[in-house]
């Protein structure tokens, strides 16, 4: 078995490539996906390889982006939402906490919003206090959400 070393950015890019290549229902949606300033090297050329209909760069609207992804997941799509700043995920709290986290239980297991949300913390040294919080532990306390991180 061949082993390969990855840094975080390359590992994320490799995982996204694998998912987009092997699962046609997967798409990635979020702000700044086509800009390395927003997402570093984690999205390099994915829009060119898989098309802008599967790597969707959105306007600044965390709530709308997250809500659209959750809705798409209910009809069989496998969306990945990228929030380039975890702090601004707070604008999407209704969609995350009151919808995605609860629907499976609210509808007797008939609705399974299978959405993955990736959030980026402190994209560099220039971020201020309101751009660099780590809210993982806070999200981990919400029933129905699964929080994973390296």
Go through each PLM region and give its residues.
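Thiamine diphosphate
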Residues: 1-150
């Amino acid at each position: 078995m061949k082993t390969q070393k990855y840094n975080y950015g390359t590992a994320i890019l490799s995982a996204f490539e694998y998912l987009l290549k092997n699962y046609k229902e997967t798409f990635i949606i979020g702000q700044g996906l086509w800009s390395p300033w927003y997402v570093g090297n984690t999205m390099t050329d994915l829009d060119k390889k898989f098309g802008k209909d599967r790597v969707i760069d959105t306007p600044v609207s965390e709530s709308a982006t997250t809500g659209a992804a959750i809705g798409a997941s209910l009809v069989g799509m496998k969306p990945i939402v990228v929030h380039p700043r975890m702090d601004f995920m707070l604008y999407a709290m209704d969609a995350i906490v009151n919808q995605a986290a609860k629907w499976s239980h609210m509808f007797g297991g008939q609705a399974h919003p299978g959405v993955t949300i990736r959030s980026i913390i402190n994209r560099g040294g220039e971020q201020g206090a309101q751009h660099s919080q780590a809210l993982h532990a806070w999200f981990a306390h919400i029933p129905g959400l699964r929080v994973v991180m390296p």
